[in-house]
Protein backbone atom coordinates (compact mmCIF):
# COMPACT_ATOMS: atom_id res chain seq x y z
CA UNK A 1 0.00 0.00 0.00
CA UNK A 2 1.25 3.43 -0.87
CA UNK A 3 -0.90 5.30 1.73
CA UNK A 4 -0.80 4.88 5.47
CA UNK A 5 -3.20 6.70 7.78
CA UNK A 6 -2.08 7.43 11.31
CA UNK A 7 -4.81 8.63 13.71
CA UNK A 8 -3.84 10.80 16.68
CA UNK A 9 -6.15 10.08 19.57
CA UNK A 10 -6.99 13.16 21.63
CA UNK A 11 -6.29 12.14 25.22
CA UNK A 12 -6.19 15.63 26.74
CA UNK A 13 -8.45 16.23 29.70
CA UNK A 14 -11.40 18.50 28.89
CA UNK A 15 -11.27 22.02 30.32
CA UNK A 16 -13.00 22.89 33.57
CA UNK A 17 -15.87 25.38 33.46
CA UNK A 18 -16.79 27.55 36.44
CA UNK A 19 -17.60 31.08 37.56
CA UNK A 20 -14.97 33.81 37.52
CA UNK A 21 -16.04 34.71 41.10
CA UNK A 22 -18.42 33.00 43.51
CA UNK A 23 -20.27 36.16 44.56
CA UNK A 24 -21.05 39.72 43.56
CA UNK A 25 -23.32 42.52 44.71
CA UNK A 26 -25.26 45.34 43.11
CA UNK A 27 -27.93 47.85 44.05
CA UNK A 28 -31.53 47.51 42.87
CA UNK A 29 -30.83 50.51 40.64
CA UNK A 30 -28.49 48.39 38.46
CA UNK A 31 -30.71 47.31 35.57
CA UNK A 32 -28.74 44.15 34.69
CA UNK A 33 -25.69 42.16 35.74
CA UNK A 34 -23.48 39.96 33.55
CA UNK A 35 -21.95 37.03 35.44
CA UNK A 36 -18.76 35.66 33.83
CA UNK A 37 -18.19 31.94 33.31
CA UNK A 38 -14.62 30.82 32.48
CA UNK A 39 -12.94 27.81 30.91
CA UNK A 40 -9.64 26.68 32.40
CA UNK A 41 -8.18 26.49 28.88
CA UNK A 42 -9.12 26.98 25.23
CA UNK A 43 -11.08 24.14 23.66
CA UNK A 44 -11.39 23.16 20.02
CA UNK A 45 -14.97 22.11 20.75
CA UNK A 46 -18.09 24.07 21.64
CA UNK A 47 -18.77 23.82 25.38
CA UNK A 48 -22.27 23.83 26.87
CA UNK A 49 -23.29 23.91 30.50
CA UNK A 50 -26.74 23.97 32.09
CA UNK A 51 -27.54 26.42 34.86
CA UNK A 52 -30.32 26.65 37.43
CA UNK A 53 -31.53 29.78 39.17
CA UNK A 54 -32.64 29.90 42.81
CA UNK A 55 -32.38 32.39 45.70
CA UNK A 56 -34.55 34.73 47.74
CA UNK A 57 -35.31 37.19 44.93
CA UNK A 58 -38.39 36.47 42.82
CA UNK A 59 -37.72 35.76 39.15
CA UNK A 60 -40.11 35.87 36.23
CA UNK A 61 -39.85 39.64 35.90
CA UNK A 62 -40.84 40.46 39.49
CA UNK A 63 -37.38 41.24 40.93
CA UNK A 64 -35.34 40.22 37.85
CA UNK A 65 -35.51 38.21 34.62
CA UNK A 66 -33.45 35.02 34.28
CA UNK A 67 -34.71 31.47 33.90
CA UNK A 68 -32.92 28.14 34.03
CA UNK A 69 -31.01 27.65 30.79
CA UNK A 70 -27.93 26.51 28.89
CA UNK A 71 -24.80 28.56 28.22
CA UNK A 72 -22.67 27.86 25.13
CA UNK A 73 -19.01 28.88 24.89
CA UNK A 74 -17.88 28.56 21.28
CA UNK A 75 -14.73 26.68 20.29
CA UNK A 76 -11.71 28.95 20.69
CA UNK A 77 -13.34 31.18 23.32
CA UNK A 78 -12.60 30.96 27.04
CA UNK A 79 -15.46 32.97 28.58
CA UNK A 80 -19.21 33.31 28.43
CA UNK A 81 -21.76 35.34 30.36
CA UNK A 82 -25.07 34.68 32.04
CA UNK A 83 -27.03 37.93 32.35
CA UNK A 84 -29.48 38.74 35.12
CA UNK A 85 -31.76 41.19 33.31
CA UNK A 86 -34.52 43.63 34.19
CA UNK A 87 -33.56 44.03 37.85
CA UNK A 88 -36.55 45.86 39.35
CA UNK A 89 -35.77 49.07 41.23
CA UNK A 90 -38.99 49.08 43.23
CA UNK A 91 -39.81 51.62 45.93
CA UNK A 92 -40.49 49.00 48.59
CA UNK A 93 -38.26 48.84 51.68
CA UNK A 94 -37.15 45.22 51.81
CA UNK A 95 -34.26 43.00 52.83
CA UNK A 96 -31.41 42.36 50.40
CA UNK A 97 -32.26 39.53 47.99
CA UNK A 98 -30.13 36.86 46.31
CA UNK A 99 -30.01 35.24 42.89
CA UNK A 100 -28.07 31.95 43.03
CA UNK A 101 -26.86 30.42 39.76
CA UNK A 102 -25.58 26.83 39.75
CA UNK A 103 -23.71 25.20 36.84
CA UNK A 104 -24.27 21.51 36.00
CA UNK A 105 -24.23 18.92 33.24
CA UNK A 106 -21.42 20.29 31.03
CA UNK A 107 -20.72 18.97 27.54
CA UNK A 108 -17.05 18.75 26.43
CA UNK A 109 -15.93 20.08 29.83
CA UNK A 110 -15.98 19.27 33.53
CA UNK A 111 -17.53 21.42 36.25
CA UNK A 112 -14.83 23.33 38.13
CA UNK A 113 -14.66 24.11 41.83
CA UNK A 114 -16.56 27.43 41.63
CA UNK A 115 -19.83 26.11 40.21
CA UNK A 116 -22.16 28.35 42.27
CA UNK A 117 -22.41 32.15 42.03
CA UNK A 118 -24.50 34.22 44.44
CA UNK A 119 -25.54 37.69 43.27
CA UNK A 120 -26.94 39.91 46.03
CA UNK A 121 -29.39 42.65 45.08
CA UNK A 122 -29.03 45.32 47.76
CA UNK A 123 -32.12 47.33 48.61
CA UNK A 124 -31.72 51.05 47.99
CA UNK A 125 -34.98 52.23 49.54
CA UNK A 126 -35.27 54.08 52.83
CA UNK A 127 -37.23 52.61 55.68
CA UNK A 128 -40.66 54.22 56.03
CA UNK A 129 -41.28 56.74 58.78
CA UNK A 130 -43.91 56.13 61.43
CA UNK A 131 -46.23 58.77 62.91
CA UNK A 132 -49.31 58.93 65.06
CA UNK A 133 -52.50 59.37 63.06
CA UNK A 134 -53.46 62.28 65.35
CA UNK A 135 -51.33 64.47 67.61
CA UNK A 136 -53.71 64.27 70.58
CA UNK A 137 -56.86 62.58 71.83
CA UNK A 138 -58.91 62.48 75.01
CA UNK A 139 -61.45 60.31 76.77
CA UNK A 140 -63.41 59.89 79.98
CA UNK A 141 -61.77 58.45 83.11
CA UNK A 142 -64.11 55.47 82.86
CA UNK A 143 -62.46 54.31 79.59
CA UNK A 144 -60.24 51.33 80.41
CA UNK A 145 -58.13 51.42 77.24
CA UNK A 146 -57.53 53.55 74.17
CA UNK A 147 -56.23 52.40 70.78
CA UNK A 148 -53.89 54.88 69.12
CA UNK A 149 -53.43 54.63 65.35
CA UNK A 150 -50.01 54.97 63.74
CA UNK A 151 -49.29 55.38 60.02
CA UNK A 152 -46.35 54.35 57.85
CA UNK A 153 -45.18 56.81 55.21
CA UNK A 154 -44.85 53.93 52.70
CA UNK A 155 -45.48 50.21 52.49
CA UNK A 156 -42.74 47.91 53.73
CA UNK A 157 -41.93 44.31 52.84
CA UNK A 158 -40.47 43.89 56.31
CA UNK A 159 -42.06 43.86 59.75
CA UNK A 160 -41.86 47.32 61.30
CA UNK A 161 -41.40 47.70 65.06
CA UNK A 162 -41.14 50.88 67.07
CA UNK A 163 -40.27 51.59 70.69
CA UNK A 164 -42.49 54.03 72.57
CA UNK A 165 -42.70 55.67 75.97
CA UNK A 166 -45.66 56.82 78.01
CA UNK A 167 -45.44 59.98 80.09
CA UNK A 168 -47.62 62.77 81.43
CA UNK A 169 -49.51 63.50 84.64
CA UNK A 170 -51.78 60.43 84.63
CA UNK A 171 -50.62 57.38 86.56
CA UNK A 172 -50.76 53.89 85.11
CA UNK A 173 -52.61 51.19 86.86
Where in the sequence are the language-model features?
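Short boundary segments that mark the start of a structured unit
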Residues: 1-173
Amino acid sequence: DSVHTYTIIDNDDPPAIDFNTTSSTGAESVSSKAITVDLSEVSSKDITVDYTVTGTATGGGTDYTLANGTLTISAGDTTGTITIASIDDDSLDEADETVIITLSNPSNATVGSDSVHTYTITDNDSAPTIDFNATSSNGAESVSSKALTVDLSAASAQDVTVDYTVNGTATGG
